[in-house]
Amino acid sequence: MESMLNKLKSTVTKVTADVTSAVMGNPVTREFDVGRHIASGGNGLAWKIFNGTKKSTKQEVAVFVFDKKLIDKYQKFEKDQIIDSLKRGVQQLTRLRHPRLLTVQHPLEESRDCLAFCTEPVFASLANVLGNWENLPSPISPDIKDYKLYDVETKYGLLQVSEGLSFLHSSVKMVHGNITPENIILNKSGAWKIMGFDFCVSSTNPSEQEPKFPCKEWDPNLPSLCLPNPEYLAPEYILSVSCETASDMYSLGTVMYAVFNKGKPIFEVNKQDIYKSFSRQLDQLSRLGSSSLTNIPEEVREHVKLLLNVTPTVRPDADQMTKIPFFDDVGAVTLQYFDTLFQRDNLQKSQFFKGLPKVLPKLPKRVIVQRILPCLTSEFVNPDMVPFVLPNVLLIAEECTKEEYVKLILPELGPVFKQQEPIQILLIFLQKMDLLLTKTPPDEIKNSVLPMVYRALEAPSIQIQELCLNIIPTFANLIDYPSMKNALIPRIKNACLQTSSLAVRVNSLVCLGKILEYLDKWFVLDDILPFLQQIPSKEPAVLMGILGIYKCTFTHKKLGITKEQLAGKVLPHLIPLSIENNLNLNQFNSFISVIKEMLNRLESEHKTKLEQLHIMQEQQKSLDIGNQMNVSEEMKVTNIGNQQIDKVFNNIGADLLTGSESENKEDGLQNKHKRASLTLEEKQKLAKEQEQAQKLKSQQPLKPQVHTPVATVKQTKDLTDTLMDNMSSLTSLSVSTPKSSASSTFTSVPSMGIGMMFSTPTDNTKRNLTNGLNANMGFQTSGFNMPVNTNQNFYSSPSTVGVTKMTLGTPPTLPNFNALSVPPAGAKQTQQRPTDMSALNNLFGPQKPKVSMNQLSQQKPNQWLNQFVPPQGSPTMGSSVMGTQMNVIGQSAFGMQGNPFFNPQNFAQPPTTMTNSSSASNDLKDLFG
């Protein structure tokens, strides 16, 4: 990379040095800026050709420079001869003006170091193009190195040279004397021009007589720059020292041979022995056959052979050569016509331009761009010719790249965009609008192209408006959206509303309908559809245009019309239009069809919406009912909780609610609340309830204060009382339970020895009861069974203080007393013998009359005892209807057998005091004194 940069730097430095050294100080530099070295030309390619511009007009030129350093090796007189020869050729060229001759724009200027003059812009010499790169900058420019001549360029170039020679021979009476590839210059447009008049010979006879051209003898001692190129020189010039116009035609033949033979001449001449070489050449020419001209096209081969004939009079003259069939190629004729265009009138030009589109595809792009395009754009100054020239220019633009279009064509189109007359100009532009919008830069589109379209819409000519409206949809997709929305659409609407032409109004509606797809939905709904209601006319074509826009918007997948718009604006507008009297049957059917489609969609969309709303309302109702149920359940649960709390405090000693049950209920409440959608007030209420429940759980269990009884004076233990109590208990165990009274609301309680178990706090055992039980009544560790009705109040006596209105819970909470008291099935009842109490007789004191224990035990039970003893054969707990048993073995319980008020059976209180038993009284007196 670095070596490449160094090489480039050295090249630029060298070129700059060459220019500086060659041109510096030359008067040409006062008026022209000299650019880079591009080519070489002239005799021996001695002239270096540079790009240049004129300082005053910035016009592009070519600067020819001869550096005197090239002839430093010569002696002074030889230098002078060379300089004089070069000056003579440039001066002669400057005096001659012809399209086929190189145009000199600034005459020759001489300085101490160089000779210089300026011409029209130049590409290269024909010798450079054919591969002779002498005196060219290094490296060779790719433009020259890769340059290949097209057939049409070759044909027309040779035709141009022939025309130039015809001008010299016929008009100027001059022989050029050195027609070579070095002296044929290709200008910037590709035209072939003649230069190098260093050895030209003018006729010595008056113009009306036969021209006579003096000829100088060949002097091999002269410098090569003072002699013509012998390889292209006619034989008679050397051998017979004569020259005439035919000598130039021989040179033309050798040039044609070189062009078709890659730049090589037909003969190579030994300059040291020129005469011998030409003699040998003369023999070869006399025997020249077609085999030697195989590289030359067949249609021109015979003419080249004639040009190379040894006899000058046989050679065709220049005028004859311009008319040979070889040059009748359509491309060459077209290029020739362009070169003579300035001589034609408008009618001839118009006819030529009309046929040009058929020829352009046959020509190479380089030829079109270099040769034809400049001629076409030069006609833009003639408004009458613009409609004929513009289609060809736009056709060329299609084949150009975007860069070429911007550089070569767009600057020329700028003034044409602003022309409104003739109207064909706008039509042509509108037809090619897609091309313009594709290749024109965005800034130029906004500044030049779209304003032309706007002017066409606002033009007073109805024809222009119609054409514009018809063409706009074809390129609407290329217009940027802001320009379309803010500039184009408003002008189309104005054209529709303000015109008096039905065609313009209809075309406006059709145009809008075609460009709807490039607009957004809300712009159409808010701007286009309301505009339709402003159209005043009711002609069928207008009404169908309105219907078309509605239908297009309604059915387009990108646009669409909302049901609100349909119901509120579209249908109220369309329905009255549908019954206009001007509409025929088909048009009416079209209206009705669109209206029905709109109604169907309106119905389906709104019905769907209402169905969805209905479903949502039903869901909301179900949620509201659920919330109400949740609230009622919450209130019920709260009431139950309150009742349970009341029972906790009112039923001390009863079956209390366990903590696990309350927790389960709280969890159930929480789950219900979670499942329901709660309002903020309900959530606040739930939070408060949770706080209260948490407080209740966190409180310590109620512990009644233990009152220690006042110590009483110790009394002597009465063993007799204790014994009697024990005996009564033992006796009750052997007695069967009597049958329960049907009228009693209490379940029968077993005999006196059966204990009923309650899981009560310990303070219940300390509580003084008024039902006849002692507060210090002992607990039993063994459980007994008893039938239980789970819905029965055990303690309904108003005298009961410690326990009130207790209702047992569900049956599974009842203990099972069955296992201890019910004998196995099938067991025989054994006859119980009286208990022998004689062993206890010694417990009585001697001071009292003795009554044996057996006598006491055999006394009949009184009426009180019958209340607590079940009759024989009465159902036991095993036959209880509930079938629910509570096993409380191992639990502490207090005995209720001593209190007959717990469960009286078959007992009726007499109205009077029970009669005292005399025997019993006597026995007690005997027992206790």
Curated annotation (Swiss-Prot):
The record's annotation in InterPro entries points to: ARM-like, ARM-type_fold, CIK-Related_Protein, Kinase-like_dom_sf, Prot_kinase_dom
Which protein, by its recorded name, is this? SCY1-like protein 2
Residue ranges of every copy of the Protein kinase domain listed in the record: 32-327
Show the GO MF annotations: ATP binding; protein kinase activity; signaling receptor binding
Residues bearing PTM Phosphoserine: 677
Q: Which UniProt keywords apply?
A: Coiled coil, Cytoplasmic vesicle, Disease variant, Endosome, Golgi apparatus, Membrane, Phosphoprotein
Q: Where is the composition biased (Low complexity)?
A: 695-705
Say if the entry is tagged with keyword Secreted: no
Statement: the UniProt record of this protein carries the keyword Phosphoprotein: yes
Recorded name of the encoding gene: SCYL2
